[in-house]
Amino acid sequence: MNRLAHYLRMCYRLTLNADKQEETLWKEMKKFHLRQDYPSGIYEKEKTISATLKLTEYKSETFSYSLVFGQYYCNVRLIRSYPEELSPEIFILTTHLNNILIEGGVSVDTEEQCVEYTIRKDILVTLLYPGFIYERINRHYKVAKRLHQAFTRLINENEAPALIVADILKSLEKEEK
C-alpha cells in the first residue's frame, strides 16, 4: 500500500505546474528544517532557509537552501577571505576539485576573495523522490566539510594543490572499500 501511495503522489506531482511544484517543495523543505535540531532561519519571501552548521570543531558556517528559477540550491561559503597572493593556488585547487566532484561546483569570487560550494538540482527531481531533501543536504554538508579542509590546508599549511587532491582521492578510495 505504501508503494501505491508513493506512486500516486509522484503522478500527482508530475501534473502540477511549475509554481505549484515550487510551492509544494518549499513546504516540504520548511517541514524538514523545522524537524531538525540545528539553528536555522526561514525566509519566506526569498524562499531560502539558512542553517548554521559546523565545518570544523571551531568553525561554523551558514548553509543556504533555496528555490530559485525552478532550481533547488544548496550553498555554503567555504572560505570567507583568502590571501591575495594565494589566488593562483586557490584557482588550481578549485579546478582540480571541480574535476572530481560528482555534483555541484566550487567557485571563487575574486572581488570578495571567497570560495563557495553550490549544488543545483531541478525542483521536480527533488520533489518526486522522498528523502531527496535530506540526501541533498547531507551530501552537501559532508562534501563541504571535506572541501573546507582542503582549502584550509592550502591557506594555513601552504600545501600544494596536487598533494591535497591526491590525499582526497586516497581517502575516497579507502571509503569505497
What residue ranges belong to the model's regions?
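A conserved amphipathic terminal alpha-helix motif
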Residues: 133-155
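Well-ordered alpha/beta subsegment
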Residues: 108-134, 156
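Short, internal acidic amphipathic alpha-helical interface segments
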Residues: 77-118
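Short, highly charged C-terminal tails/helix-capping segments
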Residues: 152-177
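Short, surface-exposed charged micro-motifs
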Residues: 39-41, 64-66, 105-107
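Long, continuous compositionally biased terminal/linker segments
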Residues: 54-86
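Hydrophobic residues embedded in beta-strands of well-ordered beta-sheets
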Residues: 47-49, 72-74, 113-115
